[in-house]
């Protein structure tokens, strides 16, 4: 038997009975990409309004007696609802679905069926898989390329069918029904039980599917195909939005246009040209800045070399600069006896460092300097450089170098 969410995708709440409630765990994505394990319960109901993940469609969210349902998964002919609080078997409960999420999934899923059918009918482009994403959805087509003309024709056709208000119906067929052989589909799960659900867009397509769908294409409102991207080997990914997602996309795009108009001081039609001019100007500034930085590095190297303080340990810190700046100084000086300790970046924050000098000394001191500055680095042939997180500890690193030089001098 199909769940209530499949029999009536527009139902938003209903009353049912708890069949069982057992301890369970749920692995979720936490901040920083780490996994978090929640302890809770798997609640099984006599029937459910909440769709369990399947057919490329994510699961629903909702509540059971105002207790949040964090995940819904199918197990054979039943659905497991994960909650953090238990519910008593045999008790009657009120189930509500997160309608905004549900209707969005209905629009994207029915939109996928429509695009898949039209792409096949017009150009023989077969769908091999699809993904209902959080912001956009992707249909994988069995073709190495799809032309802009084909995309435009598919988009025009699907939107005409939406305007034609074609009905969408759901039927259940038995496994031995001969009609099953003529229905589009990618096979059934190994643990499938009961009749086969067939979703039909009148005059366009019939497809085996377990998901929730609109009852009429007019509920899709509009479909926008954003374009295609190269997919897996000999495949193309077609990216699309349906229904309310198109409106949200237009709102974001309009907001970006308004912001760019204000920043660039020009009309929408001139945005691209204005950005190109800014990019060219920035490249020229970067080139000029690099030349000046190189000249400064050469001048700095000569100043250090001719300084009365030359010898032993020579240090220099500049807030502005990069690894190239430090390497130019080291190359110009070419010190084989003096330890040269260069740093660039925020004096109390993060930055870069370079240690140059006698190969044996640098090999010994480089990792220790990195440790003092709470950074990482690598080196060879008398040069060690890396990133530091605590430039505020430069004085400690300098003291370490001075102690080493003093010890070496005393031994000589």
From Swiss-Prot:
PROSITE patterns: AA_TRNA_LIGASE_II_ALA. One of its GO terms (cellular component) is cytoplasm. Its cofactor is Zn(2+). GO terms for molecular function: alanine-tRNA ligase activity; aminoacyl-tRNA deacylase activity; ATP binding; metal ion binding; nucleic acid binding; Ser-tRNA(Ala) deacylase activity. The keyword Flavoprotein does not apply. It is found in: Cytoplasm. Zn(2+) binds at residues 109, 113, 209, 213. Binds 1 zinc ion per subunit. The modification Phosphoserine is found at residue 174. Keywords: Cytoplasm, Metal-binding, Phosphoprotein, Protein biosynthesis, Zinc. GO terms for biological process: alanyl-tRNA aminoacylation; regulation of translational fidelity. Functions in trans to edit the amino acid moiety from incorrectly charged Ser-tRNA(Ala). Belongs to the class-II aminoacyl-tRNA synthetase family. Alax-L subfamily. PANTHER family: ALANYL-TRNA EDITING PROTEIN, ALANYL-TRNA EDITING PROTEIN AARSD1. This is Alanyl-tRNA editing protein Aarsd1. The lineage of its organism: Eukaryota, Metazoa, Chordata, Craniata, Vertebrata.
């Amino acid at each position: 038997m199909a769940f209530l969410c499949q029999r009536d995708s527009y139902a938003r709440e209903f009353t049912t009975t708890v069949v069982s409630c057992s301890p369970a765990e749920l692995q979720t994505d936490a901040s920083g990409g780490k996994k978090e394990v929640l302890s809770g319960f798997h609640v099984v109901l006599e029937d459910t309004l909440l769709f369990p993940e399947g057919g490329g469609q994510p699961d629903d969210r909702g509540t059971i007696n105002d207790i949040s349902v964090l995940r819904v998964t199918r197990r054979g002919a039943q659905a497991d609802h994960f909650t953090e609080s238990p519910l008593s078997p045999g008790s009657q409960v009120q189930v509500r679905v997160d309608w905004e999420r549900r209707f969005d999934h209905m629009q994207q899923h029915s939109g996928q069926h429509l695009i898949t059918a039209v792409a096949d009918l017009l150009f023989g482009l077969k769908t091999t898989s699809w993904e209902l994403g959080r912001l956009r959805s992707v249909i994988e087509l069995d073709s190495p390329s799809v032309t802009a003309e084909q995309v435009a024709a598919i988009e025009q056709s699907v939107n005409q069918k939406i305007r034609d208000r074609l009905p969408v119906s759901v039927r259940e067929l038995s496994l031995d029904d001969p009609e099953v052989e003529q229905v589009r589909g990618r096979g059934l799960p190994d643990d499938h039980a009961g009749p086969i659900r067939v979703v039909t867009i009148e005059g366009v397509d019939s497809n085996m599917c377990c998901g929730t769908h609109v009852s009429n294409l007019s509920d899709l409102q509009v479909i926008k195909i954003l374009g295609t991207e190269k997919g897996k080997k000999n495949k193309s990914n077609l990216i699309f939005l349906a229904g309310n997602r198109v409106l949200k996309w237009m709102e974001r795009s309009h907001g970006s246009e308004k912001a760019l108009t204000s920043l660039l001081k020009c009309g929408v039609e001139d945005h691209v040209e204005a950005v190109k001019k800014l990019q060219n100007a920035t490249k020229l500034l970067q080139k000029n800045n690099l030349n000046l930085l190189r000249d400064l590095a050469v001048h700095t190297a000569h100043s250090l070399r001719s300084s009365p303080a030359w010898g032993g340990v020579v240090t220099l810190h500049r807030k502005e600069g990069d690894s190239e700046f430090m390497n130019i100084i080291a190359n110009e000086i070419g010190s084989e006896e003096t330890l040269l300790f260069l740093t660039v970046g925020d004096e109390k924050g993060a930055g870069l460092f370079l240690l140059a000098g006698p190969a044996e000394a640098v090999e010994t001191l480089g990792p220790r300097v990195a440790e003092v500055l709470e950074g990482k680095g690598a080196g060879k042939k008398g040069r060690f450089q890396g990133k530091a997180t605590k430039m505020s500890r430069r004085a400690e690193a300098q003291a370490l170098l001075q102690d080493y030089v003093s010890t070496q001098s005393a031994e000589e």
